[in-house]
Every structure is written in C-alpha cells, then in structure tokens.
C-alpha cells in the first residue's frame, strides 16, 4: 500500500470555497490561506450562535502503545462514513505540533485513506497558529524580564518566576537554561527553561476561549510569578494582556480544511493530553456543532487523560455534552496490556487479548460514569486474526457494549460505514444524560481523589510536601474551585508507565500543583512527565526532504 504522503498527494483537492458550502459557509465567511486552507470569520461564528447544536461524537482510546492507536484516523474515517450515509458532518480536530512530527510521529493528520488535507501544510506551518502562540508566550517572557530590568516595581522574585519560554520543537537541551548572562545591560540573570509550545498555557487558553473578549480576560488572569512576599503576579499586573491578544487575533479563528473524501474539517489548537487538557478549541467544536448535524471530535491519548479532561474541563464551555463516546482499541495494544512483548505483537494470541481486555473494560466503565453511551471501535491492522477479532467482540458483548470493526486506514469511508451506523443507532436509541465527575465546589484535594479513585482505580493519593503547601496557598488565593488537569503518563492508569493493563492497589503521588488560572484549571504533576520532549535516536526528520518542484517527501 502507498505511504500516507503518497496517498495524500494523489488526491485532487477541491477548493476550500467549495468544501465549506456543504455546511452553509459562503466565500465571504472565510479568510483564505491559499486555495485549500481558510480561517472562519468572527462574523460567521457569531451568526450561527443561535443555531441548535447537532449531535456530538467524542472519539477516545484505550491506553496507547508508543505508536498510538489511530484516534485521529478513526475520527476522520467515521466522519467520512457519516457523510457517505448522507449525514451532514464536520470534523473538529487538533492541529499537530511540529516537535513530534519531526521526532517520532512523522505526521499527525490521520493515515491511509482517512486523512485531512493538505497534510503537508497541516503537519508543518499550517496557518501559523503555533508560531503566533509561541510569539505571544515569548513576548510575555521578554516583558517579564524587561520589568525586572526596569526597576521591578511589582517586586517580582526572580527565583519564583513560573512562566517559561516555549518552542514548537523537541529540544531537551533547552529544558533548563540561564538567561540574562553577560553585562548588566543584558538583564537580570536567572534560571529559566523552555517548554514545547503545546504545553504553553496560552495554547490551553486559545482552546478554551469563546471569543476575543474572553481570550483577553483569560490572558489577563495568567499567573506568571510570585513576589518577594509570595503573592501571585498576574499578566494584568504587567498590563500587557491587550498586546498578547493582538498577537493572537487571527490565531483564535478556527482553520478549515478537507478530508480525502471532501468532509469539511475544523483543525484548531493542539494541547497535549498528558500535560494539558488535550482537546481542540471550544470555538471550533462549538461552531461545528452549529453548522452540522453530526460533529466528530477527539481527545488526546487514552480515555483516562483526554476524555476525562474533555468531559470535566471542556464540556462546561461547550453548548452541549457528547451524545456518544467511541473508544478506539487495537488488538496489538490489548495484547501489550495482556503481557506480550512489543516484538511479539504480530503473533496470534487470543489469551493475551482476554487479559488485555481489562484495560478496555475499565475505560468503558469509566466513560459510562459520565452517563454517555459508549461504542467500541476496533481499529483493524493487517496482522489481526479472525480468532482475535472474534475474541474481542465476544468480550465486548459480555459487558453489553456495542462493538464494530473499522478499516478506515485501508478502505476509507467504506471501512467506517458499519461503525457509523452503530454510532447513529446508539445516539438515536440511548439519550445521553451527562454527569460531571466532580463539582466546582469540591476542594482541589477532593477533585484529585475523585479522578484517581474513580477513573484510574487507584487506592489512594499521596500529596508531596510542596503539593500539601500549595493546597493551602491555592485555597487562600481562591483557586481551589477550579477544575484539576492531571499531568500523567499516557501509557498506564497509574503514574508508572510500565504498569500496563488494569492495575489496582496503587497510589498516585502528586508532587506539585501548577496554576493555570488563565486557562481555568490547576495542573497536578505526577511521575516524571516532561513538558519539553526530546528527540529519539533516529528522528523522523532524517527521512524528510523536499523535491526540486517543492513537493514534500518523507512525511508519514
């Protein structure tokens, strides 16, 4: 079979002006970035606000293998299948970070015959959103350092600046740096560091803001440092929220592209789900809901991370909760959770599927806690055997969860028809009655304990010395009513990435809390989650090139 980029480059793209007409968007409603990309205007988003929202389908997954389980591919294939069935459908997905594209992924626009296009542009600079977020973030860093240099009227303690610089690349050498070295004219020397752009609070803010006014308010509410007497310093104290909003005035507009089958797609924002809330923008999802009868969206990594955050953090900012949740599972991942070594995953092993099913079963049970109907999608791989597929289907039937095999990677929309029919049937027959896991009035401690015991199935939560102190401080600052966003490994329910399957009787340790008051949540740090990834021994970048005619090579 052709590579992803070969398939993408073989497709005759339709002008984006034609694609968007399918959902009632005119040429005057968009701002073109070439022939095949556009941004949606504020005027159009405002005009559709009164529309009744359509059905919302959330795609999530089991705890993934390092290669991922195909959520984006499944989301795209499902949307294409729904459109093939005559349902007016839109996609609402995250945009890729250049760091993982150059590092391990090599691309993140779907795969096979379930891709969003133009995939080369989407995977590289797209419409410049990532650069705008990077610029806004680093402008704030420069303004903080300038405040120190120009007399430090706010009394900022340089040792307690928590705002870091960012870069949209994987660069481990920048995790910890010292800035301001040299003569006094170069600034105040202090420790600093870089995160990857998608870990920036500004990325989370962009994805949760409902309009420019809300964006400006959220930017003003960012905590950047503490004073010498340990009081928080906000962006509003620096009086630069207007400038940051100005930098982001176009980046906040959702991007319009198309799938291989011509399904309109809104691709906007891309926070990671292991260190942030892992969902595309509220503006993109809300607008898609008001333009289409069905909206398909995804949440990053497994349901214990992205879906939990979607349901507890994002949904309160949306016009409605999901009508159905699709959990993507692969037999290779289930076998890995069942104890099979990565090198042996291609061999048939029904017993390992049975053992690994405990992971999928827990995710199904977790999503059912939110009172939303669940469907399991088996993402088919070439090495899957009939016996393994039959084993998994039988196990799903035992817990009374609908299950369908989907081959959208190999067969595109046709490979997702059975799944699409089941999802539509479930939505029609089972009304969602969304219930949040916790209340805003719960303390931070109670929220963390709820997530750990009810979603991870952990025994208890251990709060480290710093976290214990912060629980008291954050309550004093009035931050204890915010939602919790757990920073945790994506590979396990626990904070130990090697503890696969469905572990029980484990503790989760919260070593520190990080206030993201602009985004509107508090991050709980567990384990050793990195906010600036490194590159692998053989980065995907080594296979990339460009032909003399400008055609991209090596993206996959």
From Swiss-Prot:
It is an enzyme of class 6 (ligase). Keywords: ATP-binding, Ligase, Nucleotide-binding, One-carbon metabolism. Belongs to the formate--tetrahydrofolate ligase family. InterPro entries: Formate_THF_ligase, Formate_THF_ligase_CS, P-loop_NTPase. This is Formate--tetrahydrofolate ligase 1. NCBIfam families: PRK13505.1. Pfam families: FTHFS. It catalyses: (6S)-5,6,7,8-tetrahydrofolate + formate + ATP = (6R)-10-formyltetrahydrofolate + ADP + phosphate. GO terms for biological process: tetrahydrofolate interconversion. Pathway: One-carbon metabolism; tetrahydrofolate interconversion. GO terms for molecular function: ATP binding; formate-tetrahydrofolate ligase activity. ATP binds at residues 65-72. Its EC number is 6.3.4.3.
């Amino acid at each position: 079979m052709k590579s992803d980029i070969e398939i993408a480059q073989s497709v005759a793209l339709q002008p984006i002006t034609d694609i968007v007409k399918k959902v009632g968007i005119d040429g005057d409603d968009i701002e073109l970035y070439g022939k095949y990309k556009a941004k949606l205007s504020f005027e159009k988003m405002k005009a559709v606000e009164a529309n009744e929202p359509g059905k919302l389908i959330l795609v999530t997954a089991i705890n993934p293998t390092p290669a991922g389980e195909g959520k984006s591919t499944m989301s795209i294939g499902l949307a294409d299948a729904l459109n093939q069935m005559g349902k007016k459908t839109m996609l609402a997905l995250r945009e890729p970070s250049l760091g993982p594209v150059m590092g391990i992924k090599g691309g993140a626009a779907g795969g096979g015959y379930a891709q969003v296009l133009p995939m080369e542009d989407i995977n590289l600079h797209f419409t410049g959103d990532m650069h705008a977020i990077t610029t806004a973030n680093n402008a704030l860093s420069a303004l903080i350092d300038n405040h120190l240099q120009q007399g430090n009227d706010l009394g900022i303690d340089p040792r307690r600046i928590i705002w870091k610089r960012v870069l949209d690349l994987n660069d481990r050498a920048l995790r910890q740096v010292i800035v301001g070295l040299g003569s006094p004219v170069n600034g105040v020397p202090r420790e600093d560091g870089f995160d990857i752009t998608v870990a920036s609070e500004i990325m989370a803010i962009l994805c949760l803001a409902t309009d420019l006014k809300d964006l400006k308010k959220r930017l003003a509410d960012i905590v950047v440092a503490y004073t010498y007497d340990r009081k928080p310093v906000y962006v509003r104290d620096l009086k630069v929220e207007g400038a940051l909003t100005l930098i982001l005035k176009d980046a906040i507009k959702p991007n319009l592209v198309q799938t291989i089958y011509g399904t309109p797609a809104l691709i906007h924002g891309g926070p990671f789900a292991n260190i942030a809330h892992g969902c595309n923008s509220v503006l993109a999802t809300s607008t898609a809901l008001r333009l289409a009868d069905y909206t398909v969206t995804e949440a990053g990594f497994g349901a214990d991370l992205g879906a939990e955050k979607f349901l507890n953090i994002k949904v309160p900012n949306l016009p409605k909760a999901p009508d159905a949740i699709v959990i993507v599972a692969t037999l290779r991942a289930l076998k890995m959770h069942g104890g099979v070594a990565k090198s042996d995953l291609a061999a048939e092993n029904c017993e390992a599927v049975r053992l690994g099913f405990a992971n999928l079963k827990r995710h199904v049970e977790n999503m059912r806690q939110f009172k939303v109907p669940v469907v399991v999608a088996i993402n088919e791989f070439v090495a899957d055997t009939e016996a393994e597929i039959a084993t998994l289907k039988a196990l799903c039937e035992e817990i009374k969860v609908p299950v369908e095999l989907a081959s959208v990677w190999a067969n595109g929309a046709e490979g997702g028809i059975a799944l699409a029919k089941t999802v539509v049937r479930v939505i029609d027959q089972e009304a969602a009655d969304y219930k949040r896991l916790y209340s805003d009035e719960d303390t931070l401690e109670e929220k963390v304990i709820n997530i750990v015991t009810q979603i991870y199935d952990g025994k208890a939560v251990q709060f480290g010395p710093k976290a214990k102190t912060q629980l008291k401080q954050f309550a004093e600052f009035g931050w204890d009513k915010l939602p919790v966003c757990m920073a945790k490994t994506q590979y396990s329910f626990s904070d130990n990435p090697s503890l696969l399957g469905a572990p029980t009787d484990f503790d989760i340790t919260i070593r520190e809390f990080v206030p993201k008051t602009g985004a509107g949540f508090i991050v709980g740090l567990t384990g050793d989650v990195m906010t600036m990834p490194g590159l692998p021994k053989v980065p995907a970048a080594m296979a990339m090139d460009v032909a003399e005619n400008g055609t991209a090579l090596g993206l996959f």
